[in-house]
Amino acid sequence: MKFSLCMIVKNEEAVLNRCLESMASAMDEIIIVDTGSTDATKKIATAYTDQIYDFAWTGNFAEARNYAASKATGDYIYTADADEYLEPEELQKLLQLKKVLLPEVEIVQMLY
């Protein structure tokens, strides 16, 4: 199973590294959609992915998330906000899930 991390971000330099560092090893691709950052958000993201896209903010989170999802090639899309992160034990649960996840499963949700 291939997992795509899809994120929409704007001015998240204070938290983005922690988020991506905690999730990167479980993801097969990382897609960052930037809605107009003026800080180092995109520079931080380049340490984890080259799939960074600019998206003009329209005031519609669903539109931005759908744009991010349209860039994904994974079997599953993991969405996260930049201030979210996985604790090591949660990361291990996700890595284990990837090994046993059945193709007919369409939705997985983790508590945080």
Which residues does each predicted region cover?
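Short, well-ordered alpha-helix to beta-strand connector turns
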Residues: M27, T49, A72-G74, V105
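Acidic helix N-cap motif at the loop->helix transition within catalytic regions
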Residues: A14-N17, D39-Y48, E89
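N-proximal low-complexity "stem/linker" segments adjacent to membrane-targeting elements
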Residues: M1-S25
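A conserved acidic beta->alpha catalytic loop
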Residues: S22, A26, D34-I44, W57, ...
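Conserved donor NDP-sugar-binding/catalytic core segment of glycosyltransferases
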Residues: E84-Y112
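Conserved donor nucleotide-binding strand/loop of the catalytic core
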Residues: K42-K71
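Short aromatic/hydrophobic "clamp" motif used to bind/position activated sugar donors
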Residues: I77
